[in-house]
Curated annotation (Swiss-Prot):
Keywords: Cytoplasm, Gluconeogenesis, Glycolysis, Isomerase
Main location: cytoplasm
Family the UniProt entry places it in: Belongs to the GPI family.
HAMAP family in the cross-refs: G6P_isomerase (MF_00473)
Stated name of the protein: Glucose-6-phosphate isomerase
GO biological process: gluconeogenesis; glucose 6-phosphate metabolic process; glycolytic process
Protein's pathway: Carbohydrate biosynthesis; gluconeogenesis; Carbohydrate degradation; glycolysis; D-glyceraldehyde 3-phosphate and glycerone phosphate from D-glucose: step 2/4
NCBIfam families xref list: PRK14096.1
EC number: 5.3.1.9
Function as written in the Swiss-Prot or TrEMBL entry: Catalyzes the reversible isomerization of glucose-6-phosphate to fructose-6-phosphate.
Length: 526
């Protein structure tokens, strides 16, 4: 197409939300009208599926659960009074708690006020709060936030070192739906030990976000506060529940504006017309690009520093939801869309070279922010500001990709604020739901994650047996013998990696032999 034809296509496929000031442009996806017509029955079903989901249907059949994250910003739509209370009561409790923390009605035992927040959680309990903190936290928030989102001892040490003496004025939020997530438990126990090492009582500094009756709920009985998670909200869609709203509010972020923006977008994405429903349009673009099979990766390119973590947040939302081996009918399908990204225009000096000229196995999503900054910008060249350069880079990169047959979507937002961030979260949540329906997968469970957890648990059980065998043995053992004595003769490689790790950390294990030839190694206590 020439430039005028592209301009006409842009206008034909442009979506604009007047209330939010958000534009969605899918004109650089090269589908045609017959393709859209063929998908109409699938979208009709997707609209019906979403209506049933919001009415309280068991949309997660594998776990027998309702899917209710859309109710979080519209409690009146919840199917019963109990569900409505599960939304409104925690919201009121968060508002009351945050007010009391900020005005020092609630304060730590040995400091005048809480100065910092330490959020301990993983997956959806971390990625959403991290994205929102990066996007919306002010330069001088009422409380600075820090995250422990892994079981990495060095990473934990780094956070605790940064806090230093401020640990006594740090409010710790421990987030785990079941209370049994190993990484979160580990982080909590490490931090609890750090408090005790300084002679501080952990409980008056700690808050839990978990399901009522969970292991964490019971463990946190004497903590400063407990906030509930709903059974019908998954981790990757929990940012607008207590999981994300509590840490955001403590940073001074307007959580009511986030909820309002999400609610406005939800209204727009309930429209049962493809061309006037932004989430349906985005799902159409995804389906076209990957041929309904996820054949192309999704590259997220936000041209705003504060949106740096958006790609990491979307990585979990999209990949954990859509990456499924089987569909709802039990057929093996291997669905999913790989997501990665960084930020523009940094990416133009990193991997855009490959996007433009390498393997065409992706589609790009540009995120454009119209407002450059608060306040005026200086001119770097006559009539040109740094923001003009950034705008030029996004338009130029989009055109350069299109000219070499690389498709893209562009989302344009007026500015980065709580209302718009809430709307973006809602837009992508609904798009994932629509796409899940289009390809007939359960977008609300994660059996692959659970499989990994079980395998990790089996490794730790094997380690316990190995340590016992080594302690009781006289002399050294080769790896094969050690595996046999530990009760798993086929797990020689796992045994090798366990003892190598123990030896590297001075954990009572010595390795003798040629490290380049693992079969030669002898293991002994020491």
């Amino acid at each position: 197409m020439d430039k005028l034809q592209l301009w006409q296509r842009y206008q034909n496929w442009l979506y604009y939300h007047e209330g939010l000031g958000i534009y969605l442009d899918i004109s650089r996806m090269r589908f045609d009208d017959p393709f859209v017509d063929r998908l109409k029955p699938k979208f009709d079903k997707a609209f019906q599926d979403m209506e049933a989901l919001e009415a309280g249907a068991i949309a997660n059949p594998d776990e027998g659960r309702m899917v209710g994250h859309y109710w979080l910003r519209a409690p009146e739509l919840a199917p019963n009074d109990e569900a409505r209370k599960e939304i409104t009561e925690p919201l009121a409790a968060i508002a009351d708690f945050v007010t009391k923390v900020h005005n020092t009605t609630i304060k730590p035992p040995t400091a005048e006020k809480f100065t910092d927040v330490l959020s301990i959680g993983i997956g959806g309990s971390a990625l959403g709060p991290q994205f929102v903190a990066e996007a919306l936290s002010s330069d001088f928030p009422p409380m600075a936030i820090h995250f422990i989102d892994n079981s990495d001892p060095a990473g934990i040490d780094r956070i605790l070192t940064r806090l230093g003496d401020r640990l006594k004025s740090t409010l710790v939020i421990v987030t785990s739906k079941s209370g049994g997530t190993p990484e979160t438990r580990n982080g909590m126990l490490e931090v609890k030990a750090a408090y005790e090492a300084k002679g501080l009582d952990f409980a008056p500094h700690a808050v839990a976000v978990t399901m009522p009756g969970s292991k964490m709920d019971q463990f946190a009985e004497n903590w400063l506060a407990r906030f509930p998670m709903q059974d019908w909200v998954g981790g990757r869609t929990s940012e607008l529940s207590a999981v994300g709203l509590l840490p955001a509010a403590l940073q001074g972020i307007d959580i009511q504006a986030m909820l309002a923006g999400a609610k406005e977008m939800d209204v727009a994405t309930r429209v049962k017309d493809l061309k006037t429903n932004p989430a349906a349009l985005l799902a159409l673009a995804w389906y076209y690009s990957g041929n309904g099979k996820g054949e192309k990766d999704m590259v997220i390119l936000p041209y705003k520093d504060s949106l740096l973590l958006f790609s990491r947040y979307l990585q979990q939302l999209v990949m954990e939801s859509l990456g499924k081996e089987t569909d709802l009918d039990g057929n093996t399908v291997y669905q999913g869309i790989a997501v990665y990204g960084n930020k523009g225009s940094t990416d133009q000096h990193a991997y855009v070279q490959q996007l433009r000229e390498g393997v065409p196995n992706f589609f790009a999503t540009f995120i454009e922010v119209l407002e450059d900054r608060q306040g005026e910008s200086i001119e770097l060249d006559p009539g040109i500001t740094s923001g003009d350069y950034l705008s030029g880079f996004i338009q130029g990169t989009r055109q350069a990709l299109y000219e070499n047959n690389r498709d893209s979507v562009t989302i344009t937002i007026p500015q980065v604020n709580p209302r718009i961030v809430g709307a973006l979260i809602a837009l992508y949540e609904r798009t994932v739901s629509f796409y899940g329906s289009l390809v007939n997968v359960n977008a609300y469970h994660q059996p692959g994650v659970e499989a990994g957890k079980k395998m990790a648990a089996s490794i730790l059980s094997l380690q316990t047996e190995i340590q016992k065998v080594i302690k009781e043995s006289v002399g050294s053992l080769d790896l094969v013998t050690l595996a046999e004595k530990a009760g798993d003769p086929e797990a020689v490689e796992a045994v090798y990696k366990i003892v190598r790790h123990l030896a590297a950390n001075g954990r009572g294990v010595t390795l003798d032999g040629d490290l380049a030839n693992p079969s030669s190694l002898k293991v002994s206590a020491g």
